[in-house]
């Protein structure tokens, strides 16, 4: 197997299968049916729910992690005068009534529902007729609402993927697999990685996967050397998405060290590949990304 063959195979293995996607949609339909069948809950008739997060952006990898599902409530009929806490409690009550054997718990601002091999995070949201991008979601204390723009990342991600010949999204998935292989999946936020990768490849082009992975490690290593403060801006321009990382010195140091190690291993693999030692190079990349 050549290095390029290995990366093409890796990209394929990280994608969800058709049966997994069908399973996700079937579970979504069970959630939606439970809510729509309740006379106590009023949802928007057209497009009552939609995926968001890494699942909607096609940057989720196998095995499945959390799937974010936004439920569009009819504010005038249902939510007006009710606090987000009341709505969350009502959602959970109706979901539990219809899906009594399905594990679920409140985890503000969402309800986490555990199905076989997947978990949903269900969030009630309020939409606006004059702005398709703007939604209100419950605050973490469930005392009020705050604005969010869940569809905007899909737009810049699509642009970045097109700009890089369709290699951008698969590369993000590879980086996420490297993070998972290094035990960093829980502490390192998925959206942070997507924005960080976009920041890098707004200045570089991805010619192929090995070159793209090298650029990612090299650029992130350089960014950490020259930035002692958060540097990945939020899409809406309010704050930085990597603030959490710089607020945890031990995690920051651990992540920086993993990036440095990844850069060294990638350089070693590429050097072996350039000498025609494809098997050695492939084995190094396998160590980098781990078994699937």
Predicted stretch roles:
Residues 22-25, 41, 51, 63-77, ...:
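Histidine/cysteine- and/or acidic
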Residues 23, 29-32, 100, 105-233, ...:
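Catalytic cores of NTP-dependent nucleotidyl/adenyl transfer enzymes across multiple folds
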């Amino acid at each position: 197997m050549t290095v390029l063959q290995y990366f093409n195979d890796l990209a394929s293995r990280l994608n969800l299968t058709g049966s997994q996607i069908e399973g996700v949609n079937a579970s979504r339909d069970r959630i939606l049916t439970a809510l729509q069948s309740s006379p106590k809950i009023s949802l928007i008739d057209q497009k009552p729910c939609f995926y968001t997060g890494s699942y909607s952006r096609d940057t989720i990898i196998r095995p499945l992690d959390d799937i974010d599902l936004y439920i569009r409530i009819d504010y005038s009929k249902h939510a007006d005068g009710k606090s987000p806490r009341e709505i969350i409690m009502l959602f959970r009550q109706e979901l539990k009534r219809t899906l009594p054997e399905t594990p679920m718990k409140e985890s503000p601002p969402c309800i986490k529902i555990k199905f076989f091999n997947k978990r949903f995070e269900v969030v009630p949201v309020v939409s606006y007729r004059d702005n398709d991008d703007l939604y209100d979601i419950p605050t973490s204390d469930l005392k009020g609402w705050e604005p969010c723009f869940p569809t905007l990342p899909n737009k810049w991600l699509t642009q970045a993927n097109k700009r890089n010949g369709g290699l951008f999204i698969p590369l993000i998935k590879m980086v996420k697999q490297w993070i998972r292989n290094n035990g960093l999946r829980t502490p390192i936020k998925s959206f942070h990685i997507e924005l960080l990768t976009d920041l890098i490849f707004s200045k570089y082009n991805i010619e192929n996967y090995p070159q793209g992975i090298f650029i990612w490690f090299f650029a992130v290593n350089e960014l950490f050397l020259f930035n002692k403060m958060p540097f990945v801006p939020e899409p809406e321009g309010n704050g930085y998405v990597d603030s959490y990382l710089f607020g945890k010195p031990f995690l920051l140091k651990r992540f920086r060290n993993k990036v440095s190690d990844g850069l060294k291993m990638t350089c070693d693999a590429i050097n072996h590949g350039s000498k025609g030692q494809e098997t050695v190079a492939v084995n190094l990349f396998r160590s980098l990304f781990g078994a699937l």
